[in-house]
């Protein structure tokens, strides 16, 4: 059972480094704030100057389309001065450390820094070296808190609740920060979580996560309300985990016959980027009745607007 949710007046944390740092009041506060931005983002005038005079710096050390553009749009719609650094042309390429970069940026007095980094814990290190708030946009395979928050908002928007739902997360769990953040948040909000993956893509410590584990996808999808697919994180794999993409699709790709084991109204989710024909069938990805993948992107802007506003205050 989920703990009773009470509305929070103020966030309990200075930084957003991970879901595990948040209380259920913090989560509810962020989601309620995000809901207030949904209609604004659908209107003709999308600008709300609540962060006028504030400076937001985006540091993305890994490639990103959805998260980086979402944070940039979010900041601009709130009226902040947004600087997205091109890390390929930064002093990092000349050997500068993250700590020295942090000290340099801190001297410019930003109000908030958004960071994505390939190393787990990099955002925590940055938060210790700057005076402003730090938002984690994904650090290694550790956490991706705003993705979990936007996924939760998407589920609530469609299902009106999370508590009592059965959610399947299928794919490369070992290397997925999205999986970890979603597991933490879904457990907090009272969902039952099924993890589906080949045994060699299942974390060794998975038993500690409070989830059900399956290597058989059809069994794992049985009576699920939500099916969340994840891509293979080939860039984080140090050795070959699979014989071929074709074999992976046969056993772990979401197809109509596998989806039939979930509930008839089960929703399909994916954080992106998608690899069609590997972890998901194209027709299912584009199914207007069941796929909420585009809605995840849309609500992601609202969630990130909420996070920027809350943590800048």
Swiss-Prot record:
Its EC number is 2.1.3.2. L-aspartate binds at residues 94, 177, 231. InterPro entries: Asp/Orn_carbamoyltranf_P-bd, Asp/Orn_carbamoylTrfase, Asp/Orn_carbamoylTrfase_sf, Asp_carbamoyltransf, Asp_carbamoyltransf_Asp/Orn-bd. It catalyses: carbamoyl phosphate + L-aspartate = N-carbamoyl-L-aspartate + phosphate + H(+). GO terms for biological process: 'de novo' pyrimidine nucleobase biosynthetic process; 'de novo' UMP biosynthetic process; amino acid metabolic process. GO terms for cellular component: cytosol. Keywords: Pyrimidine biosynthesis, Transferase. Carbamoyl phosphate binds at residues 66-67, 116, 144, 147, 272-273. Heterododecamer (2C3:3R2) of six catalytic PyrB chains organized as two trimers (C3), and six regulatory PyrI chains organized as three dimers (R2). Belongs to the aspartate/ornithine carbamoyltransferase superfamily. ATCase family. This is Aspartate carbamoyltransferase catalytic subunit. It comes from Pelagibacter ubique (strain HTCC1062).
């Amino acid at each position: 059972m989920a703990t009773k949710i009470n509305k929070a007046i103020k966030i309990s944390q200075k930084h957003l480094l991970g879901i595990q740092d948040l209380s259920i009041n913090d989560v509810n506060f962020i989601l309620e704030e995000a809901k207030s931005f949904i209609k604004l983002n659908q209107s003709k005038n999308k600008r709300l100057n609540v962060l006028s005079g504030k400076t937001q710096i985006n540091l993305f050390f890994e490639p990103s389309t959805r998260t980086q553009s979402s944070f940039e749009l979010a900041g601009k719609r709130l009226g902040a001065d947004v600087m997205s650094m091109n890390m390929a042309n930064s002093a990092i390429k000349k050997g500068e450390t993250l700590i020295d970069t942090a000290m340099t940026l801190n001297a410019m007095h930003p109000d908030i820094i958004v960071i994505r980094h390939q190393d787990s814990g990099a955002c925590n290190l940055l938060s210790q070296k700057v005076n402003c708030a730090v938002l984690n946009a994904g650090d290694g395979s550790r956490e991706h808190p705003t993705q979990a928050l936007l996924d939760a908002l998407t589920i609530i928007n469609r299902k009106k609740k999370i508590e009592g739902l059965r959610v399947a997360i299928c794919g490369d769990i070992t290397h997925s920060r999205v999986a970890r953040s979603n597991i933490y948040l879904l457990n907090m909000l009272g969902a039952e979580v099924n993890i589906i993956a080949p045994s060699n893509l299942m974390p060794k410590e998975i038993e500690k996560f409070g989830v059900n584990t399956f290597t058989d996808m059809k069994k794992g999808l049985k009576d699920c309300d939500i099916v969340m697919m994840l891509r293979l994180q080939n860039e984080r794999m140090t050795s070959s985990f699979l014989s071929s993409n074709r074999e992976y699709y046969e056993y772990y790709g979401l197809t109509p016959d596998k989806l039939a084991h979930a509930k008839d109204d089960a929703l399909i989710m994916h954080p992106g980027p998608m690899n069609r024909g590997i972890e998901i069938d194209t027709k299912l990805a584009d199914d207007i009745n069941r796929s909420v993948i585009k809605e995840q992107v849309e609500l992601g802007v609202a969630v990130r607007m909420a996070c920027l506003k809350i943590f800048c205050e």
